[in-house]
């Protein structure tokens, strides 16, 4: 079920859904519950909610960058983002493999995905701040 929901979140990101739409989940734990989760199930849920928050931030940054790229560059950017998502999934599958089948697997996987997603947001935001002389930095339209 979570794999299907992840697919839906990714599809929504690529379709440009509003971050607030992505953050809505049924029975989401509260911030207080996540500050001191009492069970592994709650830790898994909190890690998943953190991933959704990171995904919402990614969606916002992704949309901002894509909207400022001309045709061919935009196509290349979108292709790179699909490849990045595949990388993130594979990296987190690997990272969580040490606890595969255990009750903490979901938590480890969602924490990994949130961490990698936040790192990508930093990279996307940097695209708007190219230092003078950096020819490898993609300059966005204003």
What are these regions (language model features)?
Residues 7-20:
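Bacterial N-terminal signal peptides
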Residues 1-5:
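Positively charged n-region of N-terminal signal peptides that target proteins for export
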Residues 21-142:
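N-terminal alpha-helical modules
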């Amino acid at each position: 079920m979570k794999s299907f929901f992840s697919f839906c979140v990714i599809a929504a990101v690529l379709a440009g859904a509003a971050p607030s739409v992505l953050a809505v989940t049924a029975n989401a734990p509260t911030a207080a519950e996540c500050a001191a989760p009492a069970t592994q199930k709650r830790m898994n849920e909190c890690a998943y909610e953190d991933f959704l928050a990171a995904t919402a931030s990614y969606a916002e940054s992704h949309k901002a960058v894509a909207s400022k790229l001309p045709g061919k560059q935009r196509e290349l950017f979108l292709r790179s983002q699909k490849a990045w998502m595949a990388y993130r999934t594979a990296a987190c599958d690997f990272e969580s493999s040490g606890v595969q089948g255990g009750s903490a697997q979901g938590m480890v996987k969602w924490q990994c995905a949130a961490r990698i997603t936040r790192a990508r947001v930093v990279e996307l935001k940097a695209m708007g701040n190219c230092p003078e002389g950096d020819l490898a930095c993609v300059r966005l339209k204003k």
